[in-house]
Curated annotation (Swiss-Prot):
It comes from the Viruses. Belongs to the asfivirus MGF 360 family. GO terms for biological process: taxis. This is Protein MGF 360-21R. Plays a role in virus cell tropism, and may be required for efficient virus replication in macrophages.
Amino acid sequence: MIKSASFKDGLELNLALMKAVQENNRGLIELFIEWGADINFGLITVNTENIRSLCRELGAKEALNKWELLNVFYTVKRFKSSNNIILCHELLSNNPLFLSENNVQLRRIINYKLKNLSINFILDEISFSEKLTRFWYALAVEYNFTEAIQYFYQKYKHFKDWRLICGVAYNTFDLHEIYNKEKTDIDINQMMELACTYRYNYPNIYYCFMMGADINRAMITSVIKSYIYNLFFCIDLGADAFEECLEIAEQTNNFALVKILSFKNYYSPDSSLLSLKTTDPEKINDLLDDETYESKNLLIYEGTDYY
């Protein structure tokens, strides 16, 4: 295991211990404990009485409570690599300890992550095991771990459009690859609405715009979500649904948005964005880096006497 490509690519030490316990590898269990792994993590995957006895000898508890299980989840997912995400899925997504309905907080975390992404299925109608699988798949796309993406893509083709949906939310590069690879039942405007439900998601908003999505619908979604920076980006791209957006802002008593939208006569499209006309994700991400990109119309608004 230590000499394997997966270990060299990077595994969280406690996750490696869990794998060694699953494989009943006494030598590796003792080695990983010597290196500093927590023997209690082994209780997640122990499957023989001999290894359970070894875990006890090494100081393990009899069982983990729901908060300790939550700590296991947070600890092993913190390490970012393709193989770490794949192994997290393989060890946890069908693990009875993690599927227990007593793990209320874990279920809330997973449901929160998947809530915006569940645009072509009903979240409450799928099993928690599937939710966990979709969660790890989404992380692979979010961090652009190509090996993990291919692993999930090949193994879970029945998750209709899931890779595309995650790309819209997190990853312009993978969105571009999968959107041009296969047909989708998801309308480009639906993709744009999803993109606008994530703050500072400029590259994916721009990509959907270049693919023909309605920028006014994007502007409306940004107002509904109260995402001011996305709103200004939509205005930069030529959105002009000010009356409808102003009505929404007034109905929700969002006075900050009312003030922004009231300056509609000051705003105009940003020609530098509109002239690029590309779907090349590298060019888009270079242009719209969230640390360097500044909205032309946001700067105009900040320059008014009423800001």
